[in-house]
From Swiss-Prot:
NDH-1 shuttles electrons from NADH, via FMN and iron-sulfur (Fe-S) centers, to quinones in the respiratory chain. The immediate electron acceptor for the enzyme in this species is believed to be ubiquinone. Couples the redox reaction to proton translocation (for every two electrons transferred, four hydrogen ions are translocated across the cytoplasmic membrane), and thus conserves the redox energy in a proton gradient. NDH-1 is composed of 14 different subunits. Subunits NuoB, C, D, E, F, and G constitute the peripheral sector of the complex. It is a peripheral membrane protein. This is NADH-quinone oxidoreductase subunit C. PROSITE patterns: COMPLEX1_30K. It catalyses: a quinone + NADH + 5 H(+)(in) = a quinol + NAD(+) + 4 H(+)(out). Pfam families: Complex1_30kDa. InterPro entries: NADH_DH_suC, NADH_quin_OxRdtase_su_C/D-like, NADH_UbQ_OxRdtase_30kDa_su, NADH_UbQ_OxRdtase_CS. Its EC number is 7.1.1.-. The gene is nuoC. It comes from the Bacteria.
């Protein structure tokens, strides 16, 4: 499998090296890094080229790296049934720079891009219907960003007296506590009772 991917990586470097910023083989998987300007051309080539045949877009997901200037990676997972291999294509972007929509190349990208926008706030230009898909219409923020609070901003519940769903500010019943426990995999620096001989 990795032999076929190594051959594919060298072929892509020769055929469309101008569209690929970086190519990495890690853990038997091939990841191509490109720019937003070259994304659609690369996805189209990967789909249409006879030696590639990546006709299935399996998923699009986001990764948040808050310490980076281009904090988001948009990752496209592709499958070639003809070659029986999978690859990833990555594009880095920030909060304000949109990524071109892949809906024209892979119509199945529609809901994947909506999910990536909903969870991370990554914008896609040319998307036919970019709106929330997993969170509520009035939801504020993007919950998979690393800077999103784990408690959220509002609590949603059904009010039986009002016979409707109500939104209320989050009210924590206790103060925030930090549970900094020792990892069971690291062991102890002290001798546990009854274990005196084990440390000798």
């Amino acid at each position: 499998m990795s032999e076929a991917l190594t051959e594919l990586a060298s072929y892509l470097g020769e055929a469309r090296g101008n569209l690929i910023a970086a190519s990495q083989m890690k853990y038997g998987e091939l990841t191509l890094t490109t720019t937003g300007e070259n994304l659609i051309a690369l996805l189209t080539f990967l789909r249409d080229d006879a030696k590639c045949g990546f006709v299935n877009l399996i998923d699009i997901c986001g990764v948040d790296w808050p310490q980076r200037e281009l904090r988001f990676d948009v990752v496209y997972h592709l499958l070639s049934p003809k070659q029986n291999v999978r690859i990833r294509v990555k594009v880095a972007t920030d909060e304000d720079t949109p990524v071109p929509s892949a809906c024209a190349v892979h119509p199945g990208a529609d809901w994947f891009e909506r999910e990536t926008w909903d969870m991370y706030g990554v914008l896609f230009t040319g998307h036919p219907d970019l709106r929330r898909i997993l969170t509520d219409y009035g939801f504020e923020g993007h919950p998979l960003r690393k800077d999103f609070p784990t408690t959220g901003f509002v609590e949603v519940r059904y009010d039986d007296a009002a016979k409707r769903v109500v939104y209320e500010p989050v009210e924590l019943k206790q103060e925030f506590r930090n549970f900094d426990f020792m990892s069971p995999w690291e062991g102890t620096d002290y001798v546990l009772p009854g274990d005196e001989k084990a440390k000798q």
